[in-house]
């Protein structure tokens, strides 16, 4: 990848945020991505667009030729248990986690690449609902003993539900 492309949604989200820490993180993102590419032996490709609000997510190629995904995100509470949850699902309806790192204001995940056929947003809403319900049934499992996952009821209370 020549130069670093930033996803539009990430830029918009940071620009709307009054947190100077997030703006500093976005300014440091090119160096963060370079560090992760060196650390894990990756060649970065163009990020997925429009992207998310908290992370740079894009396809990468490992030195051994594997096609993976790098997710480098702003460190926030919702991201803290993402790798643990993916490992708990153990590739049953979720991608594999190959590596993770947390440093400064960054959480980084090296993930298996999942190449969908049709983006869900391109199908009628009733079909979207059916896919999501099927996936949720497939993903549900009891958390491991001693887990640190937040309880959904607590999240709902925190957002006023």
Where are these regions (language model features)?
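Active-site catalytic-loop/activation-segment of kinase and kinase-like phosphoryl-transfer enzymes
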Residues: 135, 148-161
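Protein kinase glycine-rich loop
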Residues: 46-51
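Short, non-ligating residues that shape and space the ligands of small metal-coordination modules
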Residues: 145
């Amino acid at each position: 990848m020549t130069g670093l492309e930033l996803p539009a949604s990430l830029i918009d989200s940071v620009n709307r945020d009054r947190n100077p820490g997030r703006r500093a993180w976005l300014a440091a993102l090119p160096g963060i991505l370079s560090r992760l590419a060196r650390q894990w032996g990756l060649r970065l490709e163009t990020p997925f667009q429009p992207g998310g609000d908290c992370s740079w997510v894009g396809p990468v190629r490992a030195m051994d030729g594997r096609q993976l995904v790098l997710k480098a995100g702003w460190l926030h509470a919702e991201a803290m248990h993402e790798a643990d949850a993916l490992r708990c699902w153990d590739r049953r309806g979720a991608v594999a986690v190959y590596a993770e790192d947390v440093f400064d204001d960054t959480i980084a995940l090296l993930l298996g690449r999942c190449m969908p056929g049709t983006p869900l947003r391109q199908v009628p809403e009733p079909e979207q609902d059916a896919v999501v319900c099927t996936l949720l049934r497939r993903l549900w499992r009891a958390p491991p003993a001693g887990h640190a996952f937040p309880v959904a009821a607590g999240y709902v209370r925190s957002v006023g539900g």
